[in-house]
A protein has these predicted regions:
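Short, Lys/Arg-rich flexible segments
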Residues: 1-150
Length: 150
C-alpha cells in the first residue's frame, strides 16, 4: 500500500477525499447529458493543507473538465460557456461541513504532532482554498497548469 511522503504537510484522509469526489461527480452528473460517462468516472481528488492554513485541492479528471469549468473560445468560432463546477463544489464543501471537518482533522493532527502549539484560533481566521488541476489523457498541445476559475 502506497504512503504519502512525510513532508510536514497534512494530507486529507481518504474517506474525506472520497466524499469530496462524490460531491463533484454529483455536480457534474446533474449538468451533463451522459452522467455515467468518462468525465464523471475520471474524477479523483487529492487534498492537503500546505503552509499553515491553505487547503490545496487537486482535481484529477479528463482534460476537458477545465474547458467545461472555465469556458473556452473554440477555433471554429464556437463558445463553451463556463459551468463553474469548482465554485459550486466549494459551496457544497462548505454547506456539507467538509471544509470544517478537514480543518478539524488538521488541528487534531497538529496537536498530536506539535502538542505545544495553540493553533485552533489562528486556523479559524486564515482559512483559504486553492485548486490545482491535473488532466488525464490530454491531447497533443494541451497546456498544463491552467488555473481553474473559482
Amino acid at each position: 500500500m502506497g504512503r504519502y511522503a512525510n513532508t510536514g504537510e497534512f494530507n486529507v484522509l481518504y474517506p474525506t477525499r472520497r466524499r469530496m469526489a462524490t460531491i463533484l461527480k454529483r455536480i457534474i452528473r446533474n449538468d451533463v447529458v451522459d452522467g455515467q460517462g468518462t468525465l464523471v468516472e475520471s474524477i479523483r481528488i487529492n487534498a492537503k493543507i500546505t503552509g499553515f492554513e491553505r487547503l490545496e485541492i487537486q482535481i484529477i479528471a479528463m482534460y476537458y473538465f477545465i474547458f467545461l469549468n472555465n469556458g473556452a473560445y473554440l477555433w471554429n468560432g464556437g463558445v463553451i460557456t463556463p459551468r463553474d463546477y469548482v465554485a459550486q463544489f466549494t459551496d457544497e464543501l462548505n454547506s456539507a461541513g467538509i471544509t470544517a471537518e478537514i480543518y478539524s482533522q488538521y488541528t487534531e493532527w497538529l496537536a498530536k504532532k506539535f502538542p505545544i502549539l495553540q493553533v485552533a484560533e489562528i486556523l479559524e481566521k486564515n482559512q483559504r482554498i486553492t485548486y490545482t488541476f491535473e488532466a488525464i489523457d490530454p491531447p497533443a498541445g494541451f497546456q498544463p497548469g491552467v488555473a481553474l476559475d473559482v
